[in-house]
Each structure stands twice: as C-alpha cells, then as structure tokens.
C-alpha cells in the first residue's frame, strides 16, 4: 500500500489520466486484483497464474482483447507520462515489432543496483542486451564507478513500458524460455535470443519504478511533492 492505496491503483489512475484515449485493460491472475480495479471502472482480463513472464500474460490477455498494437505498462511504473506513451507509439510507426523505453542513470548506486535493469543499444537505437549487472562496464576503471562517470557515459535504465505488435506477442508466447532469460530473469532477452529486434527510445521524463520498499518510499516522497499522482 502506498498512501493508503494499492500500487496497482496508482498505475491504473495514472494511465487513465495521462492517456485517456487508450483502450485500457488489465491482465490479472487473481480475482483480488480484478476486484481492486473494478470499483474504479477499470476492465480486467483474467489469465492463468502460471505464466513465465508478464509478456506471456499479455499475450494470453490479447487473445481476448484482440488489439493489433499493445502498449504494456507494468504495474511497477506509477509515473508513466503521456510523452512516454507517445514516444512508444512513434517507435512503432515504422516496421518495429517491439519497442521499449530507457532513461539515463544519475547515480553510481542506482547503476550498480541489480533491481534496476540496464540496457545497451546500438547506433540505430536497437537493444543489444539487457542486464542486471552494470553495463557498459568500464574495464580500466574497475570498481571506481562514480556519479560523474555514470553521467558522462551511455548508462541507461530500462523502464517497464513496452509496445508490441500482436503477431510478436503470439510468437513470443510460443518461444521456449531462453538461456539468458533464465539467468537474468528478464523476459525481453527471449526476444533478443530469438534474433528479433527491440527498438529503444530514451525518455527524459522523471520516473520511479517501484520494485523495492526503498522505491516505494521514493515514490511516496514524489507524490508528496506533487510529482507522482494522476
């Protein structure tokens, strides 16, 4: 609970506020989650509880919803912005089958944190690799990574916001779990391992992914400052 409300409701209300024209659905695997959302008028699709990843769950849910293009905001991203959603849609305006967002790291502590996923991209803005480890890693600097080095180099945090074509979702759920995905516990690596591309946009919008109790405290502070509510 954050501010007396479940995090899921913060995310739901935020999306409705910043993207009111979206056909908004929630993929859930527990009637308690459905019942949490229903009083606010949010629609849910019940899915199996044994999916390997959130993307597998989205693939099942979209077989009910039937969207050609799916924007997936994970339930730990309560500060998603309208600009981020527009950026995702822009990335999907071309031939891309999947897209996601990243933002610059500001501190060495966050860059080292395994709960904050890193992404390295090629010159065309396509993901090369995602990792919980600090990447790129400065060989000649070793453990001497500081805030100044992080700010001066291409150190990007992956955000839990995706866009997919429906056909990519169908193909994703049919793929076996990849070896890298199993090691890092990062579902997007299944796409990389299969030889497919992920377009990555870099957002400057401030955001806090809530993955730990410390993140929840940071989000509560942002809400008190007026920067995190819907």
Kindly label every feature range from the protein language model.
Residues 24-26, 99, 127, 198:
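Hydrophobic/aromatic residues located in beta-strands of well-ordered beta-sheets
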Residues 1-28:
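N-terminal glycine-rich phosphate-binding loop and ensuing alpha1 helix
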Residues 25, 31-90:
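Short phosphate-binding loop-to-helix
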Residues 21, 67, 94-98, 196:
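Short, high-confidence coil segments that cap the C-terminus of an alpha-helix
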Residues 81-178:
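Conserved core of the sugar-phosphate nucleotidyltransferase
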Residues 28-29, 80, 164, 211:
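A conserved hydrophobic position in a structured secondary element of the catalytic/binding core
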Residues 67, 144-230:
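Conserved alpha/beta core of the MobA/IspD/sugar-nucleotide pyrophosphorylase nucleotidyltransferase superfamily
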């Amino acid at each position: 609970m954050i501010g007396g409300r479940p995090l899921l409701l913060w995310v739901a209300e935020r999306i409705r506020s910043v993207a009111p024209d979206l056909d908004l659905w929630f993929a859930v695997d527990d009637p308690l989650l459905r019942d949490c959302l229903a009083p606010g008028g949010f629609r849910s699709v019940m899915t199996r509880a044994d999916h390997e990843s959130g993307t597998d769950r989205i693939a099942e849910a979209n077989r009910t919803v039937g969207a050609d293009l799916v924007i997936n905001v994970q339930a730990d991203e309560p500060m998603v912005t309208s600009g981020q959603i527009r950026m995702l849609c822009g990335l999907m305006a071309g031939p891309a089958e999947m897209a996601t967002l990243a933002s610059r790291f500001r501190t060495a502590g966050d860059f080292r944190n395994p709960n904050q996923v890193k992404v390295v991209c090629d010159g065309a803005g396509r993901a090369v690799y995602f990792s919980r480890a600090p990447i790129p890693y400065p060989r000649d600097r070793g453990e001497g990574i500081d805030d100044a080095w992080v700010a001066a180099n291409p150190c990007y945090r992956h955000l839990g916001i995706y866009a997919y074509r429906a056909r990519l979702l169908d193909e994703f759920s049919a793929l076996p779990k990849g070896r890298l995905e199993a090691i890092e516990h990062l579902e997007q690596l299944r796409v990389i391992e299969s030889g497919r591309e992920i377009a990555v946009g870099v957002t400057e919008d401030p955001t806090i992914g809530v993955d730990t109790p410390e993140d929840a405290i940071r989000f509560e502070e942002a809400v008190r400052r007026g920067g995190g509510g819907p």
